[in-house]
């Protein structure tokens, strides 16, 4: 049996391709599957003014539209489709190694967050030490969330309370242009 596809032209203008019936093994017996018919779409001959260049030829090397025969003698392809009088240049251009618009997919492993206070066995957060508390503030003076600092819920509450006390006393500013 040949593995070639049979091509048939449908009178409606669509191209149908019949694929060879494939046999799948089920246990020790072979089961035949019905042939699949793929519809490819409407078949219209492209006008000769559309040229495809896969090699690097310049546009000026080709003939101009005035040298070619006009399309008024030929039948129209469809009422919906219209072609302009200018030459259309279609280039096949694909370089998979250059990707300008899409970002590169870099797979990075997220760092394991750990509670700084549990690791160093700190039970009490001193509110009188603003240089230590500044590590848990962003540049505008806001408290960093747990997902960034990696602290546990218990110590995040203690940290919040210590920072608020430090700001209330006046050791840390409430609002800043640039804390760091």
Swiss-Prot record:
Gene3D superfamilies the record matches = Ribosomal protein S18
Q: Which SUPFAM superfamilies match?
A: Ribosomal protein S18 (SSF46911)
Which organism is this entry from?
Answer: Karelsulcia muelleri (strain GWSS)
Matching entries from InterPro entries are given as: Ribosomal_bS18, Ribosomal_bS18_sf
The record describes the protein's role as:
Binds as a heterodimer with protein bS6 to the central domain of the 16S rRNA, where it helps stabilize the platform of the 30S subunit.
Cellular component terms (Gene Ontology): cytosolic small ribosomal subunit
Q: Protein name, please?
A: Small ribosomal subunit protein bS18
- Report keywords, A-Z: Ribonucleoprotein, Ribosomal protein, RNA-binding, rRNA-binding
Give GO terms for biological process.
translation
Q: Which family does the entry's similarity section mention?
A: Belongs to the bacterial ribosomal protein bS18 family.
Assembly with partners or alone: Part of the 30S ribosomal subunit. Forms a tight heterodimer with protein bS6.
Q: Which GO terms describe its molecular function?
A: small ribosomal subunit rRNA binding; structural constituent of ribosome
> Where does the secretion signal sit in this chain?
none
């Amino acid at each position: 049996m040949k593995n070639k596809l049979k091509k048939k032209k449908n009178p409606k203008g669509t191209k149908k391709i019949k694929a060879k019936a494939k046999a799948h093994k089920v246990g020790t017996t072979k089961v035949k599957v019905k042939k699949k018919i793929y519809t490819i779409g409407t078949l219209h001959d492209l006008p000769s003014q559309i040229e495809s260049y896969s090699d690097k030829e310049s546009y000026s090397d080709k003939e101009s539209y005035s040298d070619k025969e006009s399309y008024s003698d030929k039948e129209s392809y469809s009422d919906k489709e219209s072609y302009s009088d200018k030459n259309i240049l279609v280039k096949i251009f694909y370089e998979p190694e250059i990707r300008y618009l899409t970002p590169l997919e870099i797979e990075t492993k997220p760092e394991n967050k750990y509670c700084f206070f549990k690791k160093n066995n700190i039970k009490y957060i001193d509110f009188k030490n603003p240089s230590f508390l500044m590590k848990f503030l962003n540049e505008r003076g806001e408290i960093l969330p747990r997902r960034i600092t990696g602290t546990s819920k218990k110590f995040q509450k203690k940290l919040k309370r210590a920072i608020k006390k430090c700001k209330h006393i006046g050791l840390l500013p409430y609002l800043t242009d640039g804390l760091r």
